[in-house]
Amino acid sequence: NVKKQIRNLGVCCESFTGDISNYNTAMEMFDEVHRHFGNVDILVNNAGISIIGLFQDMTRDEWDRIMNVNVGSVYNCCHFAIPDMINAKSGRIINISSVWGNAGASCEAAYSATKGAVNSLTKALAKELAPSGICVNAIACGAIDTDMNSFLSDEDKLSLFEEIPAGRMGRPDEAGKLAVMLADAPSYLTGQIITLDGAWI
């Protein structure tokens, strides 16, 4: 459905379904990207899951799963995209992170840890890749109205709105617009964790 909507806008679009935390699946996806579009110019790492609950109640399998999806997928995609960017001496990597990557969240310890890792990787890669003309930045999202937050009741949302100075949750299109801005930002803007949270944290 999304692919159809994009194509209706006159934009060339392909879709790929798979577990991006799996290295071989990621390799297959980038093979498809190269076949349809050629080299990778812009990479947005947006795969992510969350597990809500006490740290002591989390199983090792749950810990490994969230680490593989939230951090492993970033490794996989960067690993396959960066060679194209180095060859072109240009490129943009945009990692979708969270305010919890800096602040940490009770009952979301693993999620917070993964986003902290993404933030550190963003800064490290920015330094490593800047000589090759590649910019690496992250968007630290606050409460965004997506399926990940669909578990919140109406009462929970009202309480949350009271905490956020903007008085609402962010919209997915606002995160998307910021990603588009970063994709075309000045090349001197790199290594930054840009917060999108309505002045919440």
Sequence positions of predicted segments:
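Residue(s) in the substrate-gating loop at a strand-loop-helix junction
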Residues: 98
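C-terminal helical subdomain
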Residues: 138, 162-189, 196-198
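Active-site helix of classical SDR
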Residues: 78, 114, 122
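Alpha-helical segment proximal to the catalytic Tyr-Lys
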Residues: 83, 127-131
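Substrate-binding pocket helix/loop in short-chain dehydrogenase/reductase
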Residues: 54-55, 62-64, 160
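Short, small/polar-rich loop/turn modules that mediate ligand/substrate recognition or access, typified
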Residues: 130, 135, 189-191
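Active-site loop immediately N-terminal to the catalytic Tyr-X3-Lys motif
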Residues: 55-56, 103-109, 131-132, 167
